[in-house]
A protein has these predicted regions:
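Residue-level signal for inorganic ion chemistry
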Residues: 10, 122, 151, 209
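S-adenosyl-L-methionine
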Residues: 1-17
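Conserved Class I SAM-dependent methyltransferase catalytic core
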Residues: 3, 145-202
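Intrinsically disordered, low-complexity segments used as extracellular stalks/linkers
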Residues: 16-44
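Conserved SAM/SAH cofactor-binding pocket of Class I
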Residues: 12-18, 42-109, 116-133
Length: 237
């Protein structure tokens, strides 16, 4: 399975429902949110949008053993590869990979049995550059297939009331991603700027949004640092 740094960071950083109720403003709704975030089997649902190889979906399944994880993608070859990766993993009974357009999930044909408590996405990020000659790389990297607006709007419609949308984007796309999320109704709750070395500016930023107003927790992470190894230690041999 191809493993990228962006996907590994997001899969290790994104919150599951176990961490949702740390916010003092949500304590009084804890039982309500727990019930809303669970399907008929009592498991929370985590949705990985644009799952690719299934890396993030598998990481979330490893981190949250009671969660049912659904990964979706519009690339049939990617879906087939992700399904093979899931079948070879210890989490095959809790991870489902579907050939599915994210926009279609808001319709009555949605395969979700209850609102997801977490949506994770490593979205395409090229907007006004020339298309890549490789069609599959174009699909993965150009946001014609999934704009930030579509991501934010559909995530708002699908997420449970106490749910969280977590993404990783280039730092030069942060303002645009935040603007679309706020326009959809979200509030930024966590930000982690990612550096490749301590003396270089951040290249990526991890962002988490919730439906309720919150004061964002802002941190910085350097690839290769002790903090980075602590965050990702469960996913590297």
């Amino acid at each position: 399975m191809k493993v990228g740094t962006d996907g590994t960071l997001l899969g290790a950083w994104a919150n599951g429902n176990q961490n949702q109720n740390e916010d003092e403003n949500e304590n009084e709704n804890e039982d309500e949110n727990q019930n809303e975030n669970q399907n008929e089997n009592g498991n929370e649902i985590i949705l990985d949008v644009g799952t690719g190889t299934g890396l993030i979906a598998l990481m979330m399944a490893q981190r949250f053993p009671k969660a049912q994880v659904i990964g979706i993608d519009i690339d049939a070859d990617a879906v087939l590869q992700a399904q093979e990766n899931v079948a070879a993993s210890p989490f095959a009974d809790r991870v489902t990979i579907l050939l599915q357009d994210f926009s279609a999930l808001t319709s009555h044909l949605s395969p979700l049995t209850s609102p997801p408590s977490v949506i994770v996405c490593n979205p395409p990020y090229f907007t006004q550059s020339l298309p890549c000659p490789d069609d599959k790389r174009t699909m993965a990297r150009h946001d014609d297939t999934l704009s930030y607006r579509t991501l934010a709007t559909n995530a708002w419609q699908l997420l449970s009331d106490g749910g969280e949308l977590s993404v990783i984007v280039p730092t030069d796309q942060q303002a645009r991603m935040e603007a679309e999320a706020v326009l959809a109704g979200f509030s930024l709750c966590r930000e982690c700027k990612v550096k490749t070395s301590t003396n270089k500016p951040p290249k990526r930023v991890l962002l988490a949004f919730r439906k309720h107003p919150s004061t964002p927790l802002r941190t910085t992470l350097t690839i290769g640092s002790a903090e980075y190894h602590e965050l990702t230690k469960d996913f590297y041999l």
